[in-house]
Amino acid sequence: METNKLSTKEVQALTELKSDLYAVNAEYAKSNTRGLKKWLRWLIFGAADAAGFVTGGGAVAISASTLAWTVTKAEREISTNSDFKDCAEVALDKGSIGYAHNELSQKIVREHQDSLLGMPIDQLAEIVEEESKAYPAIENKSVDREILKQIISTFNADASIQDNINAFKQFTNDPQKQEALDICGIVLEGLQNVSDENTTYIDQVNRLVDASPVGFQTKKMIKGGISVADASAKLWNSSELEELPKAK
């Protein structure tokens, strides 16, 4: 059973960080208009990615990301012109877990596109583990099969980011991971209001996290989850899957 009790000081620091992030989101939501119509990017896959990273590490995030996209595309019976956006690696630090996430996700989908849907989880996990060896940014190159199965069976593309995050939090009793998931969810909700080319928002988020007095390990987990979530937002061509109605 996971235990990683947070100190009163760290709980307070996390509460303040969330409050600061909500304030930043509110400013972007206020300015997010095109004429009189509000627009939002559909970034639900980032929730699966963040959950994979926080609960299992970088290799699990890549596996979860690839499976969530593949399964959702099949369920909606939509053929996309491209699985990926043109900006999949734009404005991402080449040494970051986010960059590694996008580059490796694209490689796996392109090389195994025809077999991914029916591929056993063990086989995908082995592919990701082998390919991860080339990426120093992926510190945990092992794929926990049980965590991956939980994420994919729980992921709901028709639910909100927050609903998915709340469901993923049930996988762990570790408050550090639960808090990191909460913060990744807040950031994904904020990213809905900015364009793919916008780097100002994520820069603001990272400055707030860096300045926060939360503990080193918690901060590292949060920053990795944010990097993967931001990368996911730039990766999957999710607008082509929005043809079917989704829950608000």
Regions found by a protein language model. Name each.
Residues 1-36:
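Membrane-active amphipathic alpha-helices
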Residues 3, 7-12, 27, 146, ...:
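Alpha-helical solenoid repeat scaffolds
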Residues 11-25, 85-89, 100, 184, ...:
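Membrane-inserting hydrophobic helices used for pore formation or membrane fusion
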Residues 14, 21, 48, 59-66, ...:
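Generic L/I/V-rich hydrophobic alpha-helical segments across diverse proteins
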Residues 27-58:
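Membrane-penetrating hydrophobic segments
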Residues 31, 62-127:
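Membrane-engaging insertion elements
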Residues 108, 119-197, 203:
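Membrane-insertive, amphipathic helical modules of secreted toxins and fusogens
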Residues 186-248:
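Charge-dense, extended regions
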